[in-house]
């Protein structure tokens, strides 16, 4: 079972992973789809590569568990990114779906075993 400190570390790593992956994908999108240039896309590729290392620092030893749980963080984080960066307005179903995903994260990562 994870201690409080390890849960906080794990949660912080999930937030960092989300910033790197979602931010990296957004930078690639800006570079390619919004024609901002290859420097934007290149920065996105670097961020996406850095994201790939973050999972290795999770306190849980099971890659599949970590990546499955991160999927829920990615869903909620992507919606939040859209709100903050792109002016997206999620509807109640977006928010409900994100909440379900985050409950899943809690169960997958932090339920007693």
Curated annotation (Swiss-Prot):
Membrane protein topology class: Multi-pass membrane protein
Entry's localization field: Cell membrane
Keyword list, A-Z: Cell membrane, Membrane, Transmembrane, Transmembrane helix
Highest taxon in the source lineage: Bacteria
GO cellular component annotations of the record: plasma membrane
SUPFAM superfamilies per the UniProt record, alphabetical: Multidrug resistance efflux transporter EmrE
InterPro entries xref list: UPF0060
Similarity section: Belongs to the UPF0060 family.
Listed name of the protein: UPF0060 membrane protein Mkms_2558
